[in-house]
Amino acid sequence: MLEFKESPEPDEFAREKGRKLFAGNVDFLKGVVDMNGLPPADRLEVCFAGRSNVGKSSLINAVTGRKSIARASNTPGRTQEINFFKTEDHHYLVDLPGYGFANAPIDVVKKWQQLLTSYLSGRSSLRRAFVLIDIRHGIKKIDEEIMDLL
């Protein structure tokens, strides 16, 4: 069983920084299919990871107040690239492909799973990863494996 540390209550400065992270303009920068395509590691990055169709893209749309900045779908495997969004305060929000079941050819799925693993375990500018869990299914072994990469 995973143990989770309880985070201290954020102070007012941290709360305001968190609010500003998502409150300003956010623009799509690029989608990448291999590590060579990543943008320069010149900004801090916050990524959203989780199983296929857990709501990563929808959450990005919700926190940025933009209905479709991140393309969401009811079809598992819709996000097949690592998508980078620039924030006004010089961060990247990163929408990752889902892991687990996807409606795509197996060789394509394997390629983006390798990309996901490489990104999570080796991106120097990655500062926060929000791992979304589907409450209907709970934490699966693959979720634990992803968390271990962090």
Describe each region flagged by the PLM.
Residues 1-103, 107:
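Conserved G1/Walker A P-loop phosphate-binding module
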Residues 91, 110-150:
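Conserved C-terminal guanine-recognition region of P-loop GTPase G domains, centered on the G4
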